[in-house]
Design a protein with these regions (language model features):
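Active-site rim beta-loop-alpha module in soluble metabolic enzymes
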Residues: 124, 131-189, 197
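Glycine/small-residue-rich loop that forms an oxyanion/phosphate-binding "nest" at active or ligand-binding sites
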Residues: 60-105, 109
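N-terminal beta-loop-helix "entrance" segment that forms/cooperates
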Residues: 36-57, 151-158
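Short beta-strand segments enriched in small/hydrophobic residues
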Residues: 1-19, 113-116
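Glycine-rich, highly charged phosphate/nucleotide-binding loops
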Residues: 48-65, 164-172
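Short, acidic/small-residue loops that bind anionic groups at enzyme active sites
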Residues: 88-109, 201-223
């Protein structure tokens, strides 16, 4: 099984993250599954709707090329899922949105969802996203870390102190969500998702933290297998 993972990060700007992401995904992939991680240049650096649209167009082009190259599934490895429905209308292979897959998975773990996103600019986007997926009434609150992709570089390059600081910042943002009633915490971005990837059993109070990177990959594997079974 070959899976194409579309990141919205530029490998030349944040090489440690891209290397760690590729290593992580291929390590947790099922036997016989390979994951190819591709970035976007220029990346989604100036957060906002126009940048999301621009990157979505590039992702759609890459998705078409991936299917033509024989990939079995395409993962929109960007939690906001821009262009997700357009890609599904274009490709025959399964197309998985990290945001959609994670929100649906989290809704099976608890009733009230709290999201920690990279930047406050995405807060409204995630509320709209939850509404689009039929989960609008399940989201308690969305809060932003106020980070950019490059802020994670040291942690992904192996700096343990930087990793610990980022985890501490994430937990500090997530705690008020739990205090407001969230019983599941979602890192609304693959960057923070990968950050907590090695924190097995991570919880904020009683609320489990869902690893969106793992959920997206395993969803893609599942849909490829279901397609093989059912056509």
């Amino acid at each position: 099984m070959r899976i194409f993972w579309q990141s919205f990060v530029d490998a030349s700007v944040n090489a440690p993250y891209m290397a760690r992401l590729s290593e992580y995904l291929n390590n947790i992939a099922a036997p016989g599954t390979t994951v190819q991680v591709e970035g976007i240049s220029p990346p989604d650096r100036e957060f906002g709707r126009l940048a999301e649209l621009r990157c979505a167009v590039q992702a759609i082009d890459n998705g078409i090329a991936a299917e033509e190259s024989g990939f079995d599934a395409f993962v929109m490895g960007h939690f906001q899922d821009p262009g997700l429905y357009e890609l599904r209308s274009t490709l025959d292979i399964p197309v998985v949105g990290t945001g959609e897959a994670t929100l649906l998975a989290a809704s099976q773990l608890g009733r009230r969802l709290g999201l920690v996103t990279l930047d406050p600019v995405f807060e409204v986007w995630h509320y709209e996203q939850a509404e689009r997926y039929g989960l609008g009434d399940r989201v308690v609150h969305v809060t932003g870390l106020g980070c950019k992709p490059e802020d994670f570089a040291a942690a992904f390059a192996g700096d343990q102190a930087a990793h610990a600081r980022m985890i501490e910042d994430f937990l500090a943002c997530a705690l008020p969500l739990v205090e407001r009633g969230a019983d599941v915490v979602i890192p609304a971005g693959v960057l923070p998702g990968l950050l907590i990837g090695r924190e097995r059993g991570l919880k904020v109070g009683h609320a489990p933290v869902v690893n969106c990177a793992a959920v997206a990959l395993k969803s893609a594997e599942m849909w490829v297998q279901l397609r093989q079974l059912n056509g």
